[in-house]
Amino acid sequence: MTFGIVRLYRASDPQKAADVTNNHLDKHNRKNAYIGKSITRPNVFILASRYESLSQKLEEEEENRNANLVGNLGGGEFLNISLIKPVNSTNPGKALNSNSYLSVFGGENSNVKKTVELAEKINEIDGQSLLDKGIATIQTVAITGIPMNTTFIWHAIETPETAEKVLVDGITEFHSEDGLKIVREAIPLWTTKNRGFFQTVRNMG
């Protein structure tokens, strides 16, 4: 049972927060954590953790508390915390292992089930070609949160050159015409649309 927690954290001391978190993860040999730094607000981080069981999550949380991890970050606040599950991935379990950048798009959605089905079709059509261009795709849906009807598309991007193209021109430039038809069908299902773009601080794996 794979699930995850995604946290958005605004740090008072970004470098200290990154260093303390990285050192803590290294000390405990954690391979299941990704950290990205916003390219527009460099004091904002996305912190994603992947778990294979609830017991793993509880064990790691206890390690965090015992080390006073949050207290040692130098101050800041969590802007959002969500429990999520991956439902579509072109590189299951490895998408965040080697990317240099991460683009995340999504928000509240009027029909999460249909969006998941459409995203699966898009991956069937274009998933491999995007992988060949250095872009892995993950879709996540919320398990908890307010609101809960949210789903996000993550694009894990291998190189700065590709990241620049995605940032400026959008991911649609990398899709085929058949894939774009489904993308255009899916986009209106999001009732709120948010996008974040992050530079990798720490990869999973």
Where are these regions (language model features)?
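Short S/T/G/P-rich N-terminal loop/turn motif that feeds into the first structured element of a domain
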Residues: 1-205
